[in-house]
């Protein structure tokens, strides 16, 4: 299952089922220090635009997707976001999508 940031932002009640608090700190979740002041996972998934906002929004959606799919390596995902590597994150999401469609 690959869900969009739009899906996850519209279904905050599902985060609780996954045992994810949408008020959790983005920087703590991904071991990064991108946002000052800190933002929550919910704020991150609601960000608009390219660059770091895209990384944060897509990273949170992929993180939630990775909890749904037990075959996903959450650490690779976290490292991609931590390293601000949007290309690695995009590759991760593409590979994840291919595996889910098999």
Task: Identify the meaning behind each predicted range.
Residues 1-102:
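Soluble extracellular-acting proteins and domains
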């Amino acid at each position: 299952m690959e869900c969009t940031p739009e899906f996850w932002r519209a279904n905050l009640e599902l985060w609780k089922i996954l045992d994810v608090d949408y008020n959790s700190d983005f920087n703590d979740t991904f071991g990064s220090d991108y946002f000052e002041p800190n933002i929550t996972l919910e704020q991150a998934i609601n960000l608009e635009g390219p660059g770091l906002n895209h990384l944060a929004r897509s990273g949170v959606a992929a993180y939630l997707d990775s909890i749904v799919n037990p075959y996903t390596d959450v650490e690779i995902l976290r490292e991609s976001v931590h390293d601000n590597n949007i290309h690695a994150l995009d590759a991760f999401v593409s590979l994840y999508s291919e595996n889910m469609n098999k």
